[in-house]
Design a protein with these regions (language model features):
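Short, amphipathic alpha-helical "lid/cap" segments that border enzyme active or binding sites
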Residues: 11-18, 173-181
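Gly/Ala-rich beta-loop-alpha elbow adjacent to hydrolase catalytic centers
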Residues: 32-33, 37, 41
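Active-site loop/oxyanion-hole signature of alpha/beta-hydrolase fold enzymes
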Residues: 1-30, 46-47, 72-74
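Flexible "cap/lid" loop of the alpha/beta hydrolase fold
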Residues: 46-52, 56-91, 112, 140-147, ...
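Conserved loop-alpha-helix segment in the C-terminal half of the alpha/beta-hydrolase fold
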Residues: 136-163, 170-172, 179-183
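Catalytic His-Asp charge-relay segment
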Residues: 127-133, 159
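Active-site nucleophile elbow and catalytic-triad environment of alpha/beta-hydrolase enzymes
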Residues: 103-122, 143-144
């Protein structure tokens, strides 16, 4: 697993992406963050906002300055810590295969969920951003990530609710790609419009 170590946390993953963008001298980058990846792209945008043209959050965590994944989703703490202690030497959360997870899944480092994010650059809030909630056929208000789409609305971001499950990149990749290209094109043309509900 890339960068797997008990010492590596959220800041490690953020810096890894920042380094790639800087080394490759990339401009107008569109960052897409799924699930935990939402925290990563927020952190990247905080460090190098001028290189980022869009942020797209897919059913992801949407942290504020000083928060951790566990602080905004406390219902997950016991499960993940137990899994890490039982089968991950106390620091690595094993893949849960019970629901037919894809073979490409990898263990997750516990420290990434307990480390605080730094979001102190106001320029990141000027980046056109989109938040999609995947409600899995249920009312959006009942979804555990509904709090994040509410945050996105408060920030005047484009938002949309899909009936998909948490992992459309596995179950409906063509539909997901089509919708992503659509929103990227709209933002690129500067037609921000009103946030969708």
């Amino acid at each position: 697993m890339h960068l797997a170590s008990p010492k590596n946390d959220l800041s490690t993953h953020i810096q890894d992406v920042v380094n790639v963008i800087k080394f490759e001298q990339l401009k107008s980058v569109v960052l897409i963050g799924h699930s935990y990846g939402g925290a990563v792209i927020s952190g990247v945008a905080n460090q190098i906002p001028d290189e980022i043209s869009q942020l797209i959050y897919l059913d992801s965590s949407l942290l504020e300055d000083g928060e951790t994944f566990f602080s905004v989703m406390p219902e997950e703490i016991e499960h993940y810590i137990r899994r890490a202690n039982e089968d991950g030497n106390g620091w690595l959360i094993p893949v849960d295969w019970e629901e037919g997870e894809a073979s490409g899944d990898v263990p997750h480092q516990l420290a990434t969920l307990t480390s605080k994010i730094t979001l102190d650059n106001p320029k990141r809030l000027k980046i056109p951003s989109t938040y999609w909630l995947f409600a899995d056929g249920e009312p959006a208000e009942k979804d555990e990530r509904y709090r994040f789409i509410e945050r996105a609305k408060d920030l005047k971001w484009r938002t949309q609710v899909f009936s998909w499950d948490h992992n459309p990149q596995k179950n409906r990749p063509e539909e997901l790609a089509k919708e992503l290209f659509k929103v990227i094109a709209v933002q690129a043309k500067g037609r921000s419009g009103k946030p969708e509900n």
